[in-house]
Amino acid sequence: MLYLEDYLEMIEQLPMDLRDRFTEMREMDLQVQNAMDQLEQRVGEFFMNAKKNKPEWREEQMASIKKDYFKALEDADEKVQLANQIYDLVDRHLRKLDQELAKFKMELEADNAGITEILERRSLELDTPSQPVNNHHVHSHSLGEKRKHNPSSHHSTTDHVSEKKFKSEALLSTLTSDASKENTAGCRNNLSSSSTNNVYNVNASQPLTSYNISSLSTGAGAGAITMAAAQAVQATAQMKEGRRTSSLKASYEAFKNNDFQLGISLSRDSATYSSSALASTLTQTLTSSATTDSRSGRKSKSNNKSASQQSSSSSSSSSLSSCSSSSALAHELSHQQTAAIPESDTNSQVDWTYDPNEPRYCICNQVSYGEMVGCDNQDCPIEWFHYGCVGLSEAPKGKWYCPQCTAAMKRRGSRHK
């Protein structure tokens, strides 16, 4: 499930393209404005000197002014066309994002029915601003007294920073615990007594920096959420150096920049399910420096699911049948299977309803879907092509021209000879 990495790679050049086009658009706008100012000045001089000159001079000046006005109008029309091209470019990437989201949602629903609704509802709850809970009793003082540097105020500031850091790190644990409450309430009483129970009592006076993600225990129903997070980090670590650095940085910034106010106590019983193997896998993946290509790391879901279900059924009681899907997903991460089986084309296709007004691309005259490649010829009438329609299986190196433009360039070359 590398839809995020693929989409980030696709829009990597988008900011530069937009910046170049906006710069060109701004230059054209300045050119039109300067032309209009000069024309207004010429019109004023024309009316001032019209009575003094002959009719032939007036006709000549009038024709020259009209010609310059039409040229300014053409420049303005070109600027509007450039703005429309920018709009189409952004709209094409937005539609691609919607398609990738639909594919990812269908994969999640195939593994755990109803999990996307829980994730979306939890995301809305976290996005809703809540009243911050003040766990540190800081006395109110005047503005001048607040600026004084004393040990007590310094200690409060340090505790607040540590608490903020702890809240961002505990986001994954809170997501999985709440999702397991809503989705797998009936599974908790059926787990065998051999599972590990961990109780966490967090106090504000304790050093919060000792919090370790490897000690987290999550509910059985939250296996899909934890699996998705671990797979994202794992796939990022398996990417090439350039993409891995940017993706990991984006993942860390997403956790650090979100200050979620967790006013509730984090002391809760685990759902009698041990995820130490999963947490250790996540920790090892964060520090790994594997440089294998991310596209070759996709596993076959059917083989992984069957193998993990067999191993989990041998070590669990028969009452785990209702929770076998989540436990199998968690067990899958702990074994790190190395066999990579490409997905079939039928699994990658999504039943997507297209807008009849959506632009058409490629030689097949269809809408944008899947992987597409752009022709480097600026005058290409089609511009974007599907990989399969032009016989490509991966991104071409260097400049690439479509079959029509290639044939046209060959014809022009033969004429010059």
UniProtKB/Swiss-Prot annotation:
Compositional bias (Basic residues): 136-152
Residues annotated as binding Zn(2+) 1: 362, 364, 386, 389
Gene Ontology cellular-component terms listed: Swr1 complex
GO biological process, one term: chromatin remodeling
SMART domains tied to this protein: ING, PHD
Compositional bias (Low complexity): 189-198, 284-294, 303-320
Annotated localization: Nucleus
Zinc finger residue ranges, PHD-type: 359-408
Residues the record marks as site: Histone H3K4me3 binding: 361, 372, 376, 384
Quaternary structure (record): Interacts with H3K4me3 and to a lesser extent with H3K4me2. Component of the NuA4 histone acetyltransferase complex.
Written domain comment of the UniProt record: The PHD-type zinc finger mediates the binding to H3K4me3.
Name of the protein in question: Inhibitor of growth protein 3
Species name: Xenopus tropicalis (Western clawed frog)
Gene, per the UniProt record: ing3
